[in-house]
């Protein structure tokens, strides 16, 4: 290895890396700020303009886009015609390229960033050099990640060159990196143009964790996250205690966070297998947790609990009495953390809460991807329609709205029975609505008397209304829209219960 081209925006570790290259007899070529950093550190360096014999221009937009650079990168060392061609133009081969790109992602995440600022942080020369070097990985080593500096230096010290396998691996990493970089730029500009569903979609995610296994032990799995910070997201969670999250932990935690984010008042949400098993609302977080626990003392065991307020010592004492896989909250008091951390297997996570989840959801299908807007429609309760002779009381309406927030997160067909303070029965995932209703009502038992019922979609028949009325339900909330709405309304009137239509469906598959 004789010549290296180094141009980086992230200068961590680059000076000692270059110093070692010089010790190994490698000539360093560099540009702009990187060249200045080398000169300041006393590292011998050749300026890019001395290689191209052409000055930087257009405020630095054109520096390395030159045959003297790309010819030195792309020439095949095993092809005589290539080597003769570059020699004829006095172009020398470049054996190592170390480049990382303008910080486009960091720029667009800044508050108040302008389009002009974003555009100026789109790197052109950097990706071009990386791609040229990566294409010719048979002869050229290309580094885009500071984590690979040591590997390259070790191989150079031991063998005088990098191995083919290392060059191939680094080239693959470069093409992943430039593809992700371009995807971020495309997404940013697409959002500005207002195109919701463009003809092509390229998604970029960063690997956060290789998981022990997936949904089952025979399935390999990893966790990838979107670039940047996503509030209310398990991807942005900070783990304070406990072993690594599993695949199922992550999915359950995501489900719990989505429900907890629906509420501004203190709420505790217990989840098993991506369905809530208990949700409690209170004047404080302790009361909320106790309500969630009382909602289903059996199912909460081994579950995931998300709370939207800081966990205090009293709440922690209650939670420490049972086995919980994960507790998620905005924060834990020092006393609460000390209490819960005594249980070595529990995972404690903090997540920034900021209202209900918005944006788009992506679901893979065999051979494709479904993308839809998140079910975060802002509903105006003033547009809800009372269609029965009996009007819901103020207390019933409060309970109906609370359970309506919850039922949208239960797998369809979904029925939730509850009060303004807690769920009392949850029927999830049945193939017919009456089946889910009977499960929810049976779970609620005697507590169904005086409670309310929420349904994620309309009643195809009046049997659910009749079953609810016979169990003691006093008010129902549902979207409406069935050709048999009239029959359901008449059944409600027959038993003297109120019914509210939201005109919004919340299927969840």
Swiss-Prot record:
Gene3D superfamilies recorded: 3.40.140.20, Methylglyoxal synthase-like domain
Entry annotated with the keyword Transferase: yes
Coiled-coil blocks: none
GO biological process terms on file: 'de novo' IMP biosynthetic process
Domain MGS-like stretches: 1-144
EC number, UniProt record: 2.1.2.3, 3.5.4.10
Record keywords, A-Z: Hydrolase, Multifunctional enzyme, Purine biosynthesis, Transferase
The keyword Zinc is annotated on this UniProt entry: no
Reaction it catalyzes: (6R)-10-formyltetrahydrofolate + 5-amino-1-(5-phospho-beta-D-ribosyl)imidazole-4-carboxamide = 5-formamido-1-(5-phospho-D-ribosyl)imidazole-4-carboxamide + (6S)-5,6,7,8-tetrahydrofolate; IMP + H2O = 5-formamido-1-(5-phospho-D-ribosyl)imidazole-4-carboxamide
InterPro entries: AICAR_Tfase_dup_dom_sf, Cytidine_deaminase-like, MGS-like_dom, MGS-like_dom_sf, PurH-like
HAMAP family for this protein: PurH
Family matches, as NCBIfam families: PRK00881.1 (NF002049), purH (TIGR00355)
Protein name: Bifunctional purine biosynthesis protein PurH
Annotated source species: Listeria monocytogenes serotype 4b (strain CLIP80459)
Gene: purH
